[in-house]
Amino acid sequence: MFRKGKKRHSSSSSQSSEISTKSKSVDSSLGGLSRSSTVASLDTDSTKSSGQSNNNSDTCAEFRIKYVGAIEKLKLSEGKSLEGPLDLINYIDVAQQDGKLPFVPLEEEFIMGVSKYGIKVSTSDQYDVLHRHALYLIIRMVCYDDGLGSGKSLLALKTTDANNQEYSLWVYQCNSLEQAQAICKVLSTAFDSVLTSEKP
């Protein structure tokens, strides 16, 4: 199931062009950041839908990832300042340098399931759930090269609580930028599916 899900969603050319276009617009504002060519982001605050219908909206795409760490319960003022993808990347970089987040993830691999309901991160046997991120609580997703020269990419999620009082950052490591972008594409499709179904 894992391979099918990954193969099916990674072949979506229309979503790929949307992600890469957004990536280029981010690159132009990066200045001298060495990772500029590998940044892609998904801003879920936007209510713009691509208008594509997804017949498999109930399916769940699964990806093997590793968990780096999280910064939970950020104050409202702190979280609001983390609007753009660069804000998130810089914040995570500083947190890693300050020891609040590790540079290297745990050895254990987890399964990240992405569907129209959100994201579920569970153990590889899928008996234990590590995290659940409801779709409506995900504010932004950013993927970028980890900068360690290993070819791995980081996937960062910015979420809020049900009352919009606190923000949290969740950081996962992907095997490649392609895998990280595939996760962004699936999540983008999930948002489009929900937005399309809500239209009268």
Swiss-Prot record:
Residues 34-56 have a biased composition (Polar residues). SUPFAM superfamilies: PH domain-like. Residues 139-141 are annotated as: Interaction with ITGB1. Phosphorylation at Thr-38 seems to enhance integrin alpha5beta1-mediated cell adhesion. The degree of phosphorylation is regulated by integrin-dependent cell-matrix interaction. Its main location: nucleus. The modification Phosphothreonine is found at residue 38. It holds the Pfam family ICAP-1_inte_bdg. Residues 1-10 have a biased composition (Basic residues). Key regulator of the integrin-mediated cell-matrix interaction signaling by binding to the ITGB1 cytoplasmic tail and preventing the activation of integrin alpha-5/beta-1 (heterodimer of ITGA5 and ITGB1) by talin or FERMT1. Plays a role in cell proliferation, differentiation, spreading, adhesion and migration in the context of mineralization and bone development and angiogenesis. Stimulates cellular proliferation in a fibronectin-dependent manner. This is Integrin beta-1-binding protein 1. It comes from Bos taurus (Bovine). The lineage of its organism: Eukaryota, Metazoa, Chordata, Craniata, Vertebrata.
